[in-house]
């Protein structure tokens, strides 16, 4: 039976990012088979019963969605100011899985965005240690001066 680190299992189940899962473990929110676990690196298998604050960890089937994010929508699962989020859009379309965006696009930006409940994939795509190259295409109105481009690193422009 395959064993994996508890924080990885939690991230893959969509509980939180790996780092946030580590914090939950250390702070005493996680039990494995009814026993409180506060040590990072604890290994679990698919047959272990994991709970976070008493809620069983559900190992969901991975789901992946591509959304053409419209302008005026927040790239987040929740917004404390009540603005519409990318997750709201998918829920309106019938998606019931606990999903979250991979990366972000600004409020006034449109573009394709990946949303998933696959924490392992999200981590591989977003964590700098994996060195995943990302390409952005920007369409601007008017001319861009050299002064406007100064904050952008020319070494990353093509």
Describe the predicted segments one by one.
Residues 88:
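Short proline/glycine- and basic residue-enriched helix-capping loop/turn segments at helix->loop/beta transitions
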């Amino acid at each position: 039976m395959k064993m994996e680190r508890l924080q990885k299992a939690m991230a893959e189940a969509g509980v939180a990012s790996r780092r946030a899962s580590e914090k939950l473990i250390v702070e005493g929110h996680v039990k494995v088979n009814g026993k409180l676990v506060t040590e990072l690196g604890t290994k679990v298998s698919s047959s272990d019963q994991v709970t976070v604050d008493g809620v069983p960890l559900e190992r969901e089937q991975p789901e992946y969605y591509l959304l053409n994010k419209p302008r005026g929508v927040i790239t987040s699962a929740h917004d404390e100011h009540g603005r519409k989020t990318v997750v709201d859009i998918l829920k309106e379309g019938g998606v019931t899985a606990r999903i979250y965006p991979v990366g972000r696009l600004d409020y006034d930006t449109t573009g394709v965005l990946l949303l998933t409940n696959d924490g392992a994939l999200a981590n591989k795509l977003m964590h700098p240690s994996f060195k995943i190259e990302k390409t952005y295409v920007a369409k601007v109105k008017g001319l861009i001066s050299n002064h406007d481009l100064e904050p952008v690193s020319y070494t990353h422009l093509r």
